[in-house]
Amino acid sequence: FGMWYRNYFLWLLTYVSRLMLAMETGCSDEILFPGESALSSYNIRTIERLKIPMKNIMPYDEVVWHVDRLTLVHDEPFRGNRLREFRDIVSCNSPRPPWRKVFVSREKAQYRRLVNQDEVWPIFKRMGWQKVCMEDLSFDDQIKLMSETRAFSSLNGAGFGNIIFMPKGAHVFELCNEEIMSASFYAMACAMDHHYWLGKSFLVGKDYRYAFDDVIVDIHAVESILNLIEYQLT
């Protein structure tokens, strides 16, 4: 496996599918994760929920390994059918239809923050949304929360990958930096059979790192889109 498995978004987007493929093809007896000496908690919980024995997982940082047979997993675009299957595996199967509307705040993040969140959040709150910082939740709690969610909004970031755990037909509202617009989350939303909405935002300052800039969003545009989502939900 490649060396980006400590990136939450890439883990969900690509590595989960590779683990499932390894299981199907009988290649999951010994899985090597290069470059890191320890797996994160979400790495471990994913592996456990896929029912792969942890004894089969071997993180390593050695320069040279000698193996009898090595299978390399090709780094290719994600497969929607794999992500939908993973959602079915880990979903909480609540008898109650999804009811939450979740706004994920990046106020605890070190970068890519919403500068005018104090103006934006009251609009969400007035329409019955709840504010969440994903840093406060375990991986299992994030899955449970999203399985109960019918509408989701946030700035683009790693936590956006959690939309794969939302039930089919949910609404996804991305607040996107218009200078670095990407189709990644749109493609993911489509793959999971969600409705997708886009709200553009504007840079504040200029971070030397690509795509790390803080942003401001147009509160009137946000309110307009939220009204459309609310109409669709009701």
Identify the residue ranges that each predicted region occupies.
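The feature primarily captures lumenal catalytic ectodomains
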Residues: 1-234
